[in-house]
Amino acid sequence: MKIPQKFFARQHEIAADYLKELDKHLDDIVSGRVTEMFEVRDFAELIHVHPTHLSNTIKSATGHSPCYFFEERLMDISKSMLQNMSIPISEVARTLTYDPSNFTKFFKHFSGQTPKQYRESYFLGLNNETQLETDKKLKVSPF
């Protein structure tokens, strides 16, 4: 039995709609327009499908659960915010609707380091890159 191409197109449409709504919601969280994180059922309601159907469809279309994309994007946003030294880690946590200790647990679970360790290693890496660039500029060619 051949599965109609229309079925696969709809799967990808649902997945794309979810990712679009996810990005919009996370932008709203970061900007402060929204103060509570959505759950899968909230996204399902926005795109007019049942939560179980949304989860199954995204898993089938992408190989990953909706939570995978949510956590991946949340980690990207967290890392970006942590790269700004003027934002305290506790403020990053609260902006992303976490209390600081739960944010640390979340971040460490997905990155293998605490937010503080990530921030320190990020700036250490930047300093090393800057030093390498300076060293390259100072080297004089023997020819």
Region spans (language model):
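Residues in the recognition helix of alpha-helical DNA-binding motifs
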Residues: 57, 69, 81, 106, ...
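Alpha-helical bundle regulatory/interaction domains
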Residues: 1-52, 59-61, 65, 88-104, ...
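Generic hydrophobic, amphipathic alpha-helix propensity
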Residues: 70-71, 75
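Short alpha-helical segment immediately N-terminal to, or the first helix within
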Residues: 32-33, 80-84
